[in-house]
Amino acid sequence: MTQFTHINASGEANMVDVSAKAETVREARAEAFVHMAPETLQLIVSGQHHKGDVFATARIAGIQAAKKTWDLIPLCHPLLLSKVEVQLEAIEAENKVRIESVCKLAGKTGVEMEALTAASVAALTIYDMCKAVQKDMVIGQVRLLEKTGGKSGHFKAE
């Protein structure tokens, strides 16, 4: 079994030393979903939501969150991201919004947490903007879709 990289021999949490690692191009994609009532989704899609453009706000929130992941999650390295992209798609037949994020850099550690944070915070932003209309929305299915680069190589979710 693979050992946890953030735990030392004494069981204490520590930030991993990546100084000796080779710099490689790394990319990660993640997704999240927000399930809601058809009426709530229609407010978003039609642009009639009283708080403004929900997708634009969620996109910016996701991008900002990726850049601040190191500040939110203990032991994450501050990274010089070269790309953060957040796409939002209304899936009206299923009454949900799909969020997909992509983070990329040339560096010594991966960007999986940044991609997951971007998708998660974009979903939270949708909830925040729509909670006055509907409080029982469900955020879920947050997952890593794919990652490339680094020692562990390529991963793609099934």
UniProtKB/Swiss-Prot annotation:
Residues at the catalytic site: D128
EC number: 4.6.1.17
Binding site for substrate: L75, C76, H77, M113, E114
Organism: Vibrio campbellii (strain ATCC BAA-1116)
Catalysed conversion reaction: (8S)-3',8-cyclo-7,8-dihydroguanosine 5'-triphosphate = cyclic pyranopterin phosphate + diphosphate
Entry's Gene Ontology BP terms: Mo-molybdopterin cofactor biosynthetic process
Gene that produces this protein: moaC
Quaternary state and interactors: Homohexamer; trimer of dimers.
Family recorded in the similarity comment: Belongs to the MoaC family.
PANTHER family cross-referenced by the UniProt entry: MOLYBDENUM COFACTOR BIOSYNTHESIS PROTEIN 1, MOLYBDOPTERIN COFACTOR SYNTHESIS PROTEIN A
Pathway annotation from the record: Cofactor biosynthesis; molybdopterin biosynthesis
Gene3D superfamilies noted in UniProt: Molybdopterin cofactor biosynthesis C (MoaC) domain (3.30.70.640)
Keywords noted in UniProt: Lyase, Molybdenum cofactor biosynthesis
Role according to the record: Catalyzes the conversion of (8S)-3',8-cyclo-7,8-dihydroguanosine 5'-triphosphate to cyclic pyranopterin monophosphate (cPMP).
MF (Gene Ontology): cyclic pyranopterin monophosphate synthase activity; GTP 3',8'-cyclase activity
Protein name as catalogued: Cyclic pyranopterin monophosphate synthase
